[in-house]
Amino acid sequence: MDKAKKKRIIVYVSTIVLSIIYLFTAYKIAIGDGVFGDKEDIVTVRAKVLRITDEKETVSDEESGGKISMQYVFFEAKAVSGEVRGKTLYAVQERDLLYGLPQPTVEVGDKVILVYEPNDDGTADYYLSDFSRITPLIMLCAFFFLLILIFGRKKGLDTIISLVFTCLAVFINLIPAILNGQNIYAWSIITCVYITVMTLMLIEGLNVKCFAAGVGCVGGVLVAGALELILRDQIKMTGVLDSEWLYLYNLNPENPIDLKAIIFAMIIVGAVGAVMDVAMSIASSLCEINEKSPDLPARELLKSGLTIGRDIMGTMANTLVLAYIGSALCCMLLMVTYSSNVGQILNREQIAVE
């Protein structure tokens, strides 16, 4: 085994071990004893519907036209999780028909999530919380990972590992830290730096290309964060984008979450993936040019980098704008409907944050 390959293995294994240590330590610090750990104990069970036993409907008063307002579907289901696994459960689905898009009616064979809450007349011990979507989502993820492994091979495996670590850093470190009232700015920056370093070390290893891409990525993300801090006062940002933000603010009245800091976290976490993509693309292209033409002057190499960057910028700008529009399309439709002109739409805080 040559030295380069041995070094690559050492860096690879060290990155995985250090990532596990970091994630575990950060989780212990982030979890604390705050809001995140204070949850109502709700018993939920995954089950498969065996048969429909009864259906009932209630009619609203004459003021609303005497229309059917509620439908109750009673059914039996076999539990597939929890302490009651294997047992037959008696449950009910409550459908509010006054809404334009009520929940689909439960059918035999459906996989559902039930919540334990006996009703007054004793006809059901559980009620339908939602339809279970875990199985199709797992199949979709498995198919996605399979494609990555087929086309990426060793790089594909590295990509999957880095993706798992990235999700863990966000869901077991950053989110608990925010909910427990810790410094959102510090945790956001630390999380983004960790994601950048970990991903590049696993994908590329410890070399000049990794260093250049890492510096470019961290620098770009910090610039994005700095712009948010500078502009927030100029645009009179409140941090309240809709009712969900108010609910988040009131989770812990004694120590409310800083909504402006949440926006800061949104921006840099959302930017780190795109910036890392651009940084690695430029660094990889320049390394290939340098390997093929080692005698190329640094000035010419810099010009090549700028040319590549301009080409990437032309498509990446569209990518980012369309990604944000796509994720907020429903909100955009409502804004267009209830706004009198384009200026009023652009002046909204939701658009400013996006």
Place the predicted regions along the sequence by residue:
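Transmembrane alpha-helical segments that form the functional core of multipass membrane systems
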Residues: 142-149, 154-249, 257-270, 328
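Alpha-helical transmembrane segments and their helix-start/interface "positive-inside/aromatic belt" motifs
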Residues: 5-13, 208-221, 312-320
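Generic detector of multi-pass transmembrane helix bundles and their immediately adjacent loops
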Residues: 225-354
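Structural detector for short beta-strands of small beta-barrel domains
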Residues: 40-71, 112
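Short, structured beta-strand/loop micro-motifs enriched in basic residues and often containing a Trp
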Residues: 89-97
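Hydrophobic secretory-pathway targeting helix
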Residues: 1-42
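A short beta-strand signature
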Residues: 71-81
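Extended, hydrophilic extramembrane loops/domains of integral membrane proteins
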Residues: 97-134
